A protein has these predicted regions:
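A residue-level detector for short acidic-glycine micro-motifs
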Residues: 9, 20, 44-46, 77
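Charged, well-structured alpha/beta interaction segments
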Residues: 17, 33-35, 46-49
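Short, charged beta-turn/beta-strand-edge "cap" motif at the junction between a beta-strand
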Residues: 23-24, 46-51, 62
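Short alpha-helix capping/helix-loop boundary micro-motifs
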Residues: 27-30
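C-terminal structural segments of small proteins and small subunits
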Residues: 51-78
Length: 78
């Protein structure tokens, strides 16, 4: 069985799959609108020099999330 991680813990250059969103309703709707639904593959594109925010590639779209947001998205590594 695959191990669970916070999205913010996934190294740059790795791909993971969304398992669960542990966010409040307002942020949850924003994340869902961006296409980050369960079983969606997410590629960690790059981190800013200060480590926050991080750019992710989701369904051919680049989005940036802060660490505090990534901490609430549970993923499995591919």
């Amino acid at each position: 069985m695959a191990e669970n991680y916070k999205l913010s813990e996934v190294p740059v250059g790795k791909t993971c799959k969304v398992k669960e969103l542990k966010v409040k309703e307002l942020l949850k709707q924003r994340i869902l609108d961006l296409g980050m639904v369960p079983n969606t593959e997410v590629y960690v594109l790059r981190r800013s020099p200060w480590g926050d925010p991080t750019a992710y590639l989701i369904r051919d779209t680049c989005i940036a999330l802060r660490k505090e947001e990534g901490d609430k998205i549970i993923v499995t590594m591919n």
